[in-house]
Amino acid sequence: CKLGDDGSDVAVRLGDRIIRYRLNVPGRHWVQNSLAVLGTVSALGGDPDRAAAALADLTAPKGRGARVNVQTPAGLLTVIDDSYNASPASMRAAFAVLGNTRPQSGGRRIAVLGDMLELGAKSAQQHAALAGDLEANRIDQVFCAGPDMAALDNVLPTAMRGGKATDSKSLAPQVCNAVTAGDVVLVKGSLGSRMALIVDALRALETNDGLE
């Protein structure tokens, strides 16, 4: 498997055959999902070659890793909209995707993160534990929305702290004022964190309607 910033080239052995196919969505987790699909198709007696070919048409849906190019007055930036849901595992998978995405010249890798909800008594610890993964994936700046994400902000290196707020609506202006041409911006959080508001604010920069 060869992972790229815009997708993956996969070769899998099924019995005595090797099937090669292209996924046009980036991330190891998408590769793992595709392997499960091919295994299921094969087990049910279907045609894994046809299934592999169909996987080339797969696109990440809105809120689940869809990429949006935003042409701002300053230049182009890329938004990775992963705002629909979040867990510790899916956060780490998203960081890996961001880490494998090369910003344009002068750009940065930016993570804008909202609370992961329903984690119980150890929620703060699980949020703080994401710091090492952010550093390992060479994320340049991190913005945090929500009381649980404040625990992450508290343990980040000073140079990585982009800003924090109590909720996504309050954080949106900070993010919009910070992004520059060439940046790749991941927006992720549980649905209840309403991180889609920040995606919308970033998209509005294209028409100069961003938040003041």
What is each residue range found by the language model?
Residues 11-13:
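A general beta-strand register signal
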Residues 1-3:
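Residue-level recognition of beta-strand microenvironments
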Residues 5-6, 16-20, 24-29, 35-212:
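ATP-dependent carboxylate-amine ligase
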